[in-house]
Amino acid sequence: MPTHRQCLCIVLIILALTLSALTGRSQSTTDPHSRDRAAITQLLSVQQVAWNKGDIDAFMTAYWNSPDLTFSGTSGTQRGYEAVQARYKKSYPDRSTMGHLDFSELEFHFTGDDGALVLGHWHLTRDKDKGDIGGVFSLVWQRFPEGWRIIHDHTSAMAPTK
């Protein structure tokens, strides 16, 4: 027959295991999209690094390589991966025009297991003769077998605040 001390140890072990399981479950339900948020944030970081190296082709890898990709901005809507890529290359023909890109104020809204809307601000720090520019963006992301990709980008420039 187990002693009082052995029973107490067994009860404490069971209690510790139960609390551990409950704590793990509550953490995973607190943010069910934490891995997705991290994956998308990583892709945005890769884009930022590629842009700051002057590599538009590498920057474009976060976009869905499809004729159904869309980009909306002040010059209208471009349709298709190649059209979006051409738009970037025409608008930013050299490193000085590209400047240094920073993203900030990211907001994530998941529309299900395979969809997300990411809002944020972008800022290009450029030489004085080009001038800094920035604005806001809305990116619609979709999960594909190869990972998350931007399927629609709506980017707007904002007038600098004085």
Which residues does each predicted region cover?
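Bacterial N-terminal signal peptides that target proteins for export
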Residues: 1-11
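A solvent-exposed, acidic/Ser-Thr-rich amphipathic alpha-helical stretch
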Residues: 34-41, 56-114
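Solvent-exposed loop/turn segments at secondary-structure junctions
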Residues: 76-78, 124-125, 156-158
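Short beta-strand edge/turn micro-motifs at domain boundaries
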Residues: 27, 134-161
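A short hydrophobic beta-strand element
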Residues: 113-122
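Hydrophobic/aromatic beta-strand elements that line small-molecule binding cavities or substrate pockets
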Residues: 88-89, 103-109, 122-124, 136-142, ...
